[in-house]
């Protein structure tokens, strides 16, 4: 009873803190960035991390098993994973471009877990026989950590595409305006020189230098986080195969969840190939990662919505 009450309190505290953090970020977007508020938001995410950690530990204490047995627990663990990813640049003293992604992601997953699911789904229950294994912690935690990392990396790639697309549109309209407005020979020479600089430096110009630096950082962080998520996903799939052989007598059954996990792995393997290949631009790999964003949600929620297959124990449909 004490642990259940503690879990309830920590749930509301963590959700309240992260809501305030989101509000601070909106204030920073609407007005001038205040250093004190920025630092407060970072500390707020750290406090959220410890609250969710306490929540999961409390649930583990009174349930008797690692809290990854149903959809509610997996969503809370996913929110916890987002907070971990958020803190990595902070403690590394890097500019935290991830906060725009991790903060809304954490509040969305936790908000959906606490308010979007039926109350009955919040209750901890006895593990089904297939889940009564030491592989539960290894397999499911690796998969959820990979989802969090891959989602963050994919959203950074989406942001990269948006900035690149907007710049292409701006350049198109500026060129169209010059062509329709008439210009002298000197202006033609200037336009050709400017076009040459843009082509050779990939958006690097004096006017767009800040935007260029932003796209470089987005591409850098997207690649690093997706690489980490891909590693977690690989470990999760391999550990799941070993667990499946122990529980069902086969390493791979082409279950819907397994099939989509394989598709997810393939998509991000293609991303890593295009990203490390010098013949492809960063926008090409960003397109692949953006496709991966949708595929991850299908992999995570697809089976839960249908309630079929060997992984249906975490579905929306009560068993």
UniProtKB/Swiss-Prot annotation:
GO terms for molecular function: heme binding. Required during biogenesis of c-type cytochromes (cytochrome c6 and cytochrome f) at the step of heme attachment. The keyword ATP-binding does not apply. GO terms for biological process: cytochrome complex assembly. It comes from Ceratophyllum demersum (Rigid hornwort). The gene is ccsA. It holds the Pfam family Cytochrom_C_asm. Belongs to the CcmF/CycK/Ccl1/NrfE/CcsA family. It is found in: Plastid, Chloroplast thylakoid membrane. The chain crosses the membrane at residues 17-37, 44-64, 71-91, 143-163, 225-245, 258-275, 286-306. Keywords: Chloroplast, Cytochrome c-type biogenesis, Membrane, Plastid, Thylakoid, Transmembrane, Transmembrane helix. NCBIfam families: cytochr_II_ccsB. This is Cytochrome c biogenesis protein CcsA. It is a multi-pass membrane protein. May interact with Ccs1. The keyword Hydrolase does not apply. GO terms for cellular component: chloroplast thylakoid membrane; plasma membrane. It comes from the Eukaryota. The lineage of its organism: Eukaryota, Viridiplantae, Streptophyta, Embryophyta, Tracheophyta.
